[in-house]
Amino acid sequence: MARQNKQEAIYEFIKEQLREKGYPPSVREICNAVELRSTSTVHGHLKRLEEKGVIRRDPTKPRAIEVLEHSIMKKEMVDIPVVGTVTAGKPILAVENIEDTFALPINYVRNKKQLFALKIKGDSMIDTGILDGDLAIVEKNNSVLNGEIVVALLGDRATVKRFFKEKDYIRLQPENETMEPIIVKQCEIIGKVVGVYRKY
């Protein structure tokens, strides 16, 4: 099995069996699936999953395990702010800049620093797959490397470009062959793009 903790593996196996067979696995089947020898260990994991509110069991029945999907979704997702506009001189996450929220898997957010989503306007990054109307998932961070896609503040507007620190200037390179790079002496880097969401 893929490397993951046993509790996660048990939960995923229960969901898989419910999807494929329509009923949950037995404790012995769980043992075999996640490579545990002791049924008491599985019972312990099931008890902890129940305490977390992600499954429900009927102790009078051997296979009565119910997955509480609504609870799972709520526990596994977290909202990040969606920024519609960026105003010079104000924090990126100022209340007046936030238009909405967007749900991301909690594991994704846990491994990053402060995240927000920015609405993309225009087609300057189409060659890298970032299109007008997309939501760019941005990690708030002003320390970036050459070649990374960043959100830079130029005057009173934010722009998403590929960042290059040259000898005497900064080059903000679009990913659109019809557009010229933006050359500036300095600019404020708000963060780097770590993902893109597109609604179909």
Swiss-Prot record:
Per the record, the domain of life is: Bacteria
Q: Which Pfam families match?
A: LexA_DNA_bind (PF01726), Peptidase_S24 (PF00717)
User: What Gene3D superfamilies does the database record attribute to this sequence?
Assistant: Umud Fragment, subunit A, Winged helix-like DNA-binding domain superfamily/Winged helix DNA-binding domain
EC number from the UniProt entry: 3.4.21.88
Q: Which reaction does it catalyse?
A: Hydrolysis of Ala-|-Gly bond in repressor LexA
Q: Where is this site: Cleavage?
A: A88, G89
Which residues form the DNA-binding region?
27-47
Per the record, the GO terms for biological process are: DNA repair; DNA replication; negative regulation of DNA-templated transcription; proteolysis; SOS response
Which residues constitute the catalytic centre? S124 (for autocatalytic cleavage activity), K161 (for autocatalytic cleavage activity)
Quote the InterPro entries the UniProt record gives: ArsR-like_HTH (IPR011991), LexA (IPR006200), LexA-like (IPR039418), LexA/Signal_pep-like_sf (IPR036286), LexA_DNA-bd_dom (IPR006199), LexA_repressor (IPR050077), Peptidase_S24_LexA (IPR006197), Peptidase_S24_S26A/B/C (IPR015927)
Q: Which GO terms describe its molecular function?
A: DNA binding; serine-type endopeptidase activity
Keywords (alphabetical) are: Autocatalytic cleavage, DNA damage, DNA repair, DNA replication, DNA-binding, Hydrolase, Repressor, SOS response, Transcription, Transcription regulation
State the function annotated in the UniProt record.
Represses a number of genes involved in the response to DNA damage (SOS response), including recA and lexA. In the presence of single-stranded DNA, RecA interacts with LexA causing an autocatalytic cleavage which disrupts the DNA-binding part of LexA, leading to derepression of the SOS regulon and eventually DNA repair.
Assembly and interaction partners: Homodimer.
Q: Which PANTHER family match?
A: LEXA REPRESSOR, LEXA REPRESSOR-RELATED
Q: Give the family, as the similarity comment puts it.
A: Belongs to the peptidase S24 family.
Identification of the protein by name = LexA repressor
